[in-house]
């Protein structure tokens, strides 16, 4: 068996020891080496040729962001998983790491002593992410017969809402898609990105600086407005409900689905109920299959589904399940998704004007 080789970069002796302990228990993973700071790690890359790097954000001499910036000059495709804290500073730094090319991140709990629950929390995050990133996770679901073959180049029902779901690689994908939506975009956009509390707020703030239409983390019982983007809050599901002649956004802490809260499936089911055939759903890069069942529900309601292609996905898990099941009417590179959203919404707006 060819084991996946991991280079651990962390200034903490305790964390380095814990990661060694975690990886030693996985038959398909091995520690290629350890480094206490970025300078040492960069010197070790040629010698060790790791398959993936775990990189702490806060380190002396050369921190994780500086290390990542240098690493990406020579190794643009090497998977890098950042280690961050559940703090405002950690959230901001993690989003900056994504802009520099980080593949994913793991949050360090306050309790990470040997034998503590923190160790299992790190294991539960880290091991699946290493496997997904290094094996370019392919969905196990076999292709299913195409049941939804409606040609929506000229859709019969105008698009009245856009719902987007993403996970691993999502922040960068969203930064490539959402800024394409122009000022005056006529429908609301709802986004689920798998992230913990605080991280989602800073993600929304970053996207708001990049986009032509306002972006904000969703608030409880918020009235849906066209031409706005709302991001689900970490540790809360986001749903859309009818309210008289309009719609309302809700936050809830119902049970996780697909081990996720917020979950894409929860959002997709709610928009299918609220908007029916007027939904345009987009499933982008991410591990696992969150969004698959919700995409089925949207297609059964007459809505439209687009999936990101494998070549531009960091992990082709979520969009791959949707594409392989024949649920996606189009499978597109991330660079084309924003324009496709605008095209389909514009067709519907033109239909309404001509009605």
Swiss-Prot record:
Contains a C-terminal catalytic domain, and an N-terminal region which modulates catalytic activity. The lineage of its organism: Bacteria, Pseudomonadati, Acidobacteriota, Terriglobia, Terriglobales. GO terms for cellular component: cytoplasm. Belongs to the CheB family. Its EC number is 3.1.1.61, 3.5.1.44. It is found in: Cytoplasm. It comes from Koribacter versatilis (strain Ellin345). It is an enzyme of class 3 (hydrolase). Residues 155-348 form the CheB-type methylesterase domain. One of its GO terms (molecular function) is phosphorelay response regulator activity. This is Protein-glutamate methylesterase/protein-glutamine glutaminase 1. The gene is cheB1. It catalyses: [protein]-L-glutamate 5-O-methyl ester + H2O = L-glutamyl-[protein] + methanol + H(+); L-glutaminyl-[protein] + H2O = L-glutamyl-[protein] + NH4(+). Keywords: Chemotaxis, Cytoplasm, Hydrolase, Phosphoprotein. The keyword tRNA-binding does not apply. NCBIfam families: PRK00742.1 (NF001965). InterPro entries: CheB-like, CheB_C, CheY-like_superfamily, Sig_transdc_resp-reg_Me-estase, Sig_transdc_resp-reg_receiver. Residues 5-123 form the Response regulatory domain. Involved in chemotaxis. Part of a chemotaxis signal transduction system that modulates chemotaxis in response to various stimuli. Catalyzes the demethylation of specific methylglutamate residues introduced into the chemoreceptors (methyl-accepting chemotaxis proteins or MCP) by CheR. Also mediates the irreversible deamidation of specific glutamine residues to glutamic acid. Phosphorylated by CheA. Phosphorylation of the N-terminal regulatory domain activates the methylesterase activity. The modification 4-aspartylphosphate is found at residue 56. Its main location: cytoplasm. It comes from the Bacteria. The keyword Protein biosynthesis does not apply. The active site is at 167, 194, 290. GO terms for biological process: chemotaxis.
